[in-house]
Amino acid sequence: MKIYTRTGDKGSTQIYADKAVRVDKDDLVVQSYGDMDELNSHIGLLAAHVTDKHKPILQDIQRNLFQAGFAISASSTLTQTDIENLESLIDNITRQMPPNTSFVLPGGSKASAQAHVCRAVCRRAERAVISLSKHYDVPEVVHAYLNRLSDFLFTFARFMNVEAGVDEVPV
């Protein structure tokens, strides 16, 4: 199967909902997909900067981002349990760190800096999905998952600095 089809050369693409539909490439659905795809790619880069013990968590998140995209277009296995799993990860990581008492500058170790990039891209994806939901039916689980994921990514960024022995820099 070829990667190119030439059908999108004039600015439209095919998406799948209950049936295949052609939309402009700047459609809110395509924008939401793109933001989640960018986030997924950044999380892949983050995985390249962490120890092996953290990679399964990030790969699960990447799979869930695919499910979030599927939820927008057709069907998904993304559930409240996936949100609760993120909350559990946040709680477990938070217990292993000093309390957060101020805003901190994004950065520190490579893994922390990349986690902060992921967090910012996640927030953009969340905003795109909220805009999309004003025009299309988007399952609430997608909104909640992206919101919780940005919380996880902030916590994970802090934790990567703790593991690397890098002090956070307060604002």
Task: Tell what function each PLM region has.
Residues M1-V171:
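Phosphate/pyrophosphate-binding loop motifs in nucleotide- or prenyl diphosphate-using proteins
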